[in-house]
């Protein structure tokens, strides 16, 4: 057996890391409780909920004003409620609205877990075996420009060019270079728009790919790769200015609960990872 990983290569070896940092608390989507009513109105967010006016703590006697302007909303018939009651209604409405993005497949209830964590987790990190499994499945969809396919191809080419040793510095440098132009795995396929993954992890903020082991044998080779990713379960101003988000009440409620100074529910980091073994034998 020829072990490709000879000194000075240190394991784990970073093959790729996004410019975006892990644990970036300074990101705008990680801010909370930093806005007042006027800030929301300036963003066109007068209509938050179909059930309550969260600015005035009024529960509507009938379905909310929809797209009707704030002047009508303010004078709508309703009952004064406490902030706790308003919070309960908003979170229940948020869960119900999430179903339009999460109604099929084994991950359809994942968003409910995230909403619960948003309310009660106090900003702590979120981990889920479901997310790890979904990331594993996503990684192993061998698209033309997928990272795992590029890594395997670089190893194959490197070993074929130097079969006796598999000259590791050239192989690793080739992987690092080609990963720069790869298509990172995200939950943005068509099915993710309704299976619960797109709404649960609407983007991946940071990713890291590391080599854990890499060995060359007389009859083939094997490598173990660690894929680590992090999303922010939070919304920034750019998100809510985007019509793709702001047209849905789900995101307006989310943004309100996070950013209004009187509610200020903390966003959090969603962490997931998978370890993949790739190999080829004669």
Describe the role of every protein-language-model region:
Residues 183-219:
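Amphipathic, interaction-prone secondary-structure segments
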Residues 28-31, 46, 61, 66, ...:
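A generic structural signal for solvent-exposed, polar alpha-helical segments
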Residues 235-282:
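Active-site or metal-binding loop neighborhoods of secreted/extracellular toxin and effector enzymes
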Residues 37, 57-59, 111-116, 204, ...:
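Generic preference for hydrophobic/aromatic residues in regular secondary structure cores
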Residues 203-215, 227-235, 274-280:
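Beta-strand elements of well-folded, non-transmembrane domains
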Residues 2-198:
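Membrane-inserting hydrophobic helices used for pore formation or membrane fusion
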Residues 221-225:
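Hydrophobic residues positioned within well-ordered beta-strands of beta-sheet architectures
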């Amino acid at each position: 057996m020829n072990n490709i990983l000879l000194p000075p290569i240190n394991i784990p070896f970073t093959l790729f890391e996004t410019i975006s940092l892990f644990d970036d608390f300074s990101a705008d989507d990680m801010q909370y409780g930093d806005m007042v009513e006027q800030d929301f109105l300036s963003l066109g967010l007068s209509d938050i909920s179909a059930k309550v006016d969260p600015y005035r703590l009024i529960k509507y006697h009938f379905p909310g004003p929809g797209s009707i302007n704030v002047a009508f909303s303010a004078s709508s018939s309703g009952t004064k409620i406490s902030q706790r009651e308003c919070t309960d209604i908003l979170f229940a409405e948020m869960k119900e609205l999430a179903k339009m993005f999460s109604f099929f497949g084994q991950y359809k209830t994942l968003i409910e877990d995230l909403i619960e964590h948003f309310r009660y987790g106090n900003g702590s990190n979120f981990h889920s075996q479901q997310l790890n499994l979904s990331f594993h499945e996503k990684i192993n969809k061998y698209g033309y420009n997928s990272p795992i396919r590029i890594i395997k191809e670089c190893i194959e080419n490197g070993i074929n060019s130097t079969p006796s040793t598999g000259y590791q510095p050239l192989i690793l440098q080739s992987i690092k270079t080609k990963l720069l132009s790869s298509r990172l795995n995200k939950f943005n396929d068509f099915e993710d728009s309704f299976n619960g993954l797109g709404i649960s992890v609407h983007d991946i903020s940071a990713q890291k790919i590391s080599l854990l082991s890499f060995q060359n044998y007389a009859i083939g080779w094997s490598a173990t790769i660690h894929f680590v990713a992090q999303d922010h379960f939070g919304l920034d101003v750019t998100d809510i200015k985007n019509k793709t988000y702001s047209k849905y009440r789900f995101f307006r409620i989310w943004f309100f609960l996070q950013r209004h100074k009187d509610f200020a529910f903390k966003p959090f980091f969603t962490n997931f990872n998978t370890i993949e073994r790739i190999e080829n034998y004669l």
